[in-house]
Amino acid sequence: MPKMKTKSAAKKRFRVRPGGTVKRGQAFKRHILTKKTTKNKRQLRGSTAVHETDMGRMSQMLPGRGI
């Protein structure tokens, strides 16, 4: 059976941490920012981990990465 290919879109958007969790960027930070408070925009600045219910999909999109 051939190797599974990594999804290019997932490769650009996600990073696998050493512990096996997956790091992702925050959504809702691209446009229409005038309605959002300064506190809200500041909290959206950092990255966060992918939820455990989505980890099955992550392991399919990023095979062979220790997820």
Curated annotation (Swiss-Prot):
Family the UniProt entry places it in: Belongs to the bacterial ribosomal protein bL35 family.
Name used for this protein in its record: Large ribosomal subunit protein bL35
Compositional bias per record (Basic residues), positions renumbered to this chain: 1-16
Gene Ontology biological process: translation
Listed GO CC annotations: cytosolic large ribosomal subunit
Lineage, opening ranks: Bacteria, Pseudomonadati, Pseudomonadota, Betaproteobacteria, Burkholderiales
Pfam families: Ribosomal_L35p
Superkingdom to which the source organism belongs: Bacteria
Gene behind this protein: rpmI
GO MF annotations in UniProt: structural constituent of ribosome
